[in-house]
């Protein structure tokens, strides 16, 4: 039991460092072209982390992404994301929703052969939910302003398309990599015949 907890804590630490580094690189590559920058690598990573393990761990990927986004907002001045209800909460909810979408689709299909396709479909739906949750949180918890309007337009117009495409392609790959590195036998149980 202690070994499992130690493994989980170490895994979360490594993934947090990786997530923050990737998010920072994405931000500084695009900061001169578009604000807020698209998280085209970070979002597939957070979705893959949300599909790691069982439902109790499904909040990990989104929470790590939200915390990294919250910290980075102070570094680069994304004032809209200074509020944790905008930067952390929607990402945590999207991670949990992504797990349950993947779980539900896997239970419906019950076939190993289509798992990669289901993972890609789940990733696409999770990006859609993530965008809706973040924009909804911005609408409810933000004070508005010119930067708010720009952020709203950029997220819908540019970021969503890039993040959606990358999540569909990269999430199944990242899930396989995480599964192999952590020696997890499978992310979700397949539906057994006779159950």
Predicted regions and their residues:
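Membrane-interfacial segments
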Residues: 26-30, 34, 72, 76, ...
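Residue-level signature of transmembrane alpha-helical entry/exit and packing/kink sites
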Residues: 4-15, 39-43, 83, 87, ...
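Hydrophobic transmembrane alpha-helices
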Residues: 1-57
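Mid-bilayer segments of alpha-helical transmembrane spans in multi-pass integral membrane proteins
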Residues: 92, 96, 100, 124-136
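Alpha-helical transmembrane segments and their cytosolic interface
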Residues: 1-16, 148-195
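Interfacial aromatic-anchored transmembrane helix boundaries in multi-pass membrane proteins
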Residues: 21-38, 63-99
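Internal alpha-helical transmembrane segments of multi-pass membrane proteins
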Residues: 105-132, 186-195
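Central hydrophobic cores of alpha-helical transmembrane segments
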Residues: 59-69, 119-126
